[in-house]
UniProtKB/Swiss-Prot annotation:
<dbReference type="InterPro" id="IPR000640">
    <property type="entry name" value="EFG_V-like"/>
</dbReference>
<keyword id="KW-0694">RNA-binding</keyword>
<dbReference type="InterPro" id="IPR035647">
    <property type="entry name" value="EFG_III/V"/>
</dbReference>
<keyword id="KW-0963">Cytoplasm</keyword>
<dbReference type="InterPro" id="IPR009000">
    <property type="entry name" value="Transl_B-barrel_sf"/>
</dbReference>
<feature type="domain" description="tr-type G">
    <location>
        <begin position="8"/>
        <end position="204"/>
    </location>
</feature>
<dbReference type="InterPro" id="IPR031157">
    <property type="entry name" value="G_TR_CS"/>
</dbReference>
<dbReference type="GO" id="GO:1990904">
    <property type="term" value="C:ribonucleoprotein complex"/>
</dbReference>
<dbReference type="GO" id="GO:0019843">
    <property type="term" value="F:rRNA binding"/>
</dbReference>
<dbReference type="Pfam" id="PF00009">
    <property type="entry name" value="GTP_EFTU"/>
</dbReference>
<dbReference type="GO" id="GO:0000049">
    <property type="term" value="F:tRNA binding"/>
</dbReference>
<dbReference type="Pfam" id="PF21018">
    <property type="entry name" value="BipA_C"/>
</dbReference>
<comment type="function">
    <text>A 50S ribosomal subunit assembly protein with GTPase activity, required for 50S subunit assembly at low temperatures, may also play a role in translation. Binds GTP and analogs. Binds the 70S ribosome between the 30S and 50S subunits, in a similar position as ribosome-bound EF-G; it contacts a number of ribosomal proteins, both rRNAs and the A-site tRNA.</text>
</comment>
<keyword id="KW-0699">rRNA-binding</keyword>
<dbReference type="Pfam" id="PF00679">
    <property type="entry name" value="EFG_C"/>
</dbReference>
<dbReference type="Pfam" id="PF03144">
    <property type="entry name" value="GTP_EFTU_D2"/>
</dbReference>
<dbReference type="InterPro" id="IPR047043">
    <property type="entry name" value="BipA_III"/>
</dbReference>
Length: 616
């Protein structure tokens, strides 16, 4: 039997940090210095915790990962949490596995709204924080100010006296050093290891009781199938042990454990037996779902289901019906798209997928635009083709009143842009909650704004601040609907009237009508949007027209054609840009924007129908 000493030397901790505050780098350094990687400070791929391509590219952590460190006879399980509120479903489950949280805050930025979201959840779980002020060596670092901000945030979140009595460690994760004073850092991360060991309580568990654990994460491996990950609540587990699985509806079935896998560094290894308090992965139980309880066959007791925040944004995923459908993607049918969405549901708990009366269309709901755009981007990289509609917020009936979701927004801008940003947010029904000038020419603004007011705002915001502004948002609450339309696009679009190759000569003539989105010699189709009109109406244009060569002598007299650089949209920008009658066509090679109705006649007919119904 694993003795009591071992449990006393076990620590389970989650890391919370805002995007780009250095959490992943911090974990890398802890792994290296603890000697968990063979060579301390050896050749380790940077940002080891971000395993998904998209995560490394965007620098955000989407899926929570587990890792374990051995340090001076102690075993520290570290679980990474996503820093973004759109992945709130992940956060809830992680917190159910740990006994404390490590809050990493940038020594210049201070706490951000995403950190606020996860910290609030951690306090609700009764966890005590350890605060790490990171990047203390960066220019402009103001660690004392940041500590005050963190304290104020904790008070606002209703922290208990115990939670407010938190230890503070100052660090520079990039250099791998930490200390108890920001002027006096040690040679390595030892002060942080010591703080974790001293301040995190060992798991309070019953070792001799019958086995019980809850699945809080899932993984999949082609060789062993579904892998369930969770913390053992009580008792112990061995490979080949018979167990009972209880799902969230209370239905039970029998199973037999395959392997029991422990974590060390970023690897998993097989264990002969694992005990209460440890975070393990188990195989061999077939289809598992998050929140399932696995327990001893003689003591069938379910643990309470994990609650997950409801989705706030919905959009339609449709089969690609454009004339170029199937040219670039590997998976294009509705069956393939539905299978992929159902596979995503297994581990992406905050996602909802509903079939609609139209077999080629699925309604997909999630925690926010980012949550859904990450899924679309992953599908696109895997070879899927699909079309997606404009995101819409999900309204709820609460006590007989229709309510809409609101977001908390933190904006950091230069003072010269403050007026135009505040005006734009006012038009989108935002309410100012706080305004903090930093005395160095920048201002931090806190807003509460309806979620629909933020859809499509980020692009405008970047233009307004010439790319210097920072904008972070996280779901706040549901409240009464604010009247009126919000965030309608001001400009119309230029629509191609035929299918073929766009010619430079035609595009040159269209430049004065607005901004183009395509280069010359690109294949386009009828109904594809090729530019942004400078006025508010849509314009159907011919971009295939070559130069007439009737009068031979004059044919070369024109000035050379000069085309301005076209506007190129990323996936998120395209989703924010489109209107209700438009779709974003997503393929592994391209992102195109199109009208739902491709021909001008169909669009006119649809317009006539809507105007006649609205006049009656």
């Amino acid at each position: 039997m694993k003795n009591e000493i071992d449990i006393k030397k076990l620590r389970n901790i989650a890391i919370i940090a805002h995007v780009d505050h250095g959490k992943t780098t911090l974990v890398d350094k802890l792994l290296q210095q603890s000697g968990t990687f063979e060579s301390a400070r050896g050749d380790v791929d940077e940002r080891v915790m971000d395993s998904n391509d998209l995560e490394k590219e965007r620098g955000i952590t989407i899926l929570a990962k587990n890792t374990a460190i051995n340090w001076n006879d102690y075993r520290i399980n570290i679980v990474d949490t996503p820093g973004h509120a759109d992945f709130g479903g992940e956060v809830e489950r992680v917190l159910s596995m740990v006994d404390s949280v490590l809050l990493v805050v940038d020594a210049f930025d201070g706490p951000m709204p995403q950190t606020r979201f996860v910290t609030q959840k951690a306090f609700a779980h009764g966890l005590k924080p350890i605060v790490v002020i990171n990047k203390v060596d960066r220019p402009g670092a103001r660690p004392d100010w940041v500590v005050d901000q963190v304290f104020d945030l904790f008070v606002n979140l209703g922290a208990s006296d115990e939670q407010l009595d938190f230890p503070i460690i100052y660090a520079s994760a990039l250099n791998g050093v930490a200390g108890l004073e920001h002027e006096d850092l040690a040679e390595d991360m030892t002060p942080l290891f010591e703080a974790i060991v001293k301040h995190v309580e060992p798991p309070k568990v019953e070792l001799d009781a019958p086995f019980q654990m809850q699945i809080s994460q899932l993984d999949y491996n082609n060789y062993v199938g579904v892998i369930g990950i969770g913390r053992i609540k009580r008792g112990s587990i061995k490979p080949n042990q018979p167990v009972t699985i209880i799902n969230s509806e209370g239905k039970t079935r029998q199973g037999r454990i395959g392997q029991v896998l422990g974590h060390l560094g970023l690897q998993r290894y097989e264990e002969d037996v694992a005990y209460a308090g440890d975070i393990v992965a188990i195989t061999g139980l077939g289809e598992l779902n998050i929140s399932d309880t696995i327990c001893d066959i003689n003591t069938v007791e379910a643990l309470p289901s994990l609650t997950v925040d409801e989705p706030t944004v919905t959009m339609f995923f449709c089969v690609n019906t454009s004339p170029f459908a199937g040219q670039e993607g590997k998976y294009v049918t509705s069956r393939q798209i539905l299978e992929r969405l159902n596979k995503e549901l297994v581990h992406n708990v905050a996602l909802r997928v509903e079939e609609t009366p139209n077999p080629d269309e699925f309604r997909v709901s999630g925690r926010g635009e980012l949550h859904l755009s990450v899924l679309i981007e992953n599908m696109r990289r895997e070879g899927y083709e699909l079309a997606v509609s404009r995101p819409k917020v999900i309204y709820r009936d609460i006590d007989g009143k229709k309510q809409e979701p609101y977001e908390q927004v933190t904006i950091d801008v230069e003072e010269q842009h403050q007026g135009s940003v505040m005006e734009a947010l006012g038009i989108r029904k935002g309410e100012v909650r706080d305004m903090l000038p930093d005395g160095k020419g920048r201002v931090r603004l806190e807003y509460i704004i309806p979620s629909r007011g933020l859809i499509g705002f980020r692009g405008d915001f970047m233009t307004m601040t010439s790319g210097t502004g920072l904008l972070y948002s996280s779901f706040s609450h549901y409240d009464e609907i604010k009247g009126g339309e919000i965030g309608q696009r001001k400009n119309g679009v230029l629509i191609s009237n035929a299918t073929g190759k766009a010619l430079g000569y035609a595009l040159f003539g269209l430049q004065e009508r607005g901004k183009l989105m395509i280069d010359a010699n690109i294949e386009v189709y009828e109904g594809q949007i090729i530019g942004i009109h400078s006025r508010s109406n849509d314009l159907t244009v011919n971009c295939l027209q070559g130069k007439k060569l009737t009068n031979m002598r004059a044919s070369g007299k024109d000035d050379a054609i000069v085309l301005t650089t076209p506007v190129k949209f990323s996936l998120e920008q395209a989703i924010e840009f489109i209107d209700d009658d438009e779709l974003v066509e997503v393929t592994p090679e391209s992102i195109r924007i199109r009208k739902k109705l491709l021909t001008e006649n169909d669009r006119k007919r649809a317009n006539r129908t809507t105007t006649s119904t609205s006049t009656h």
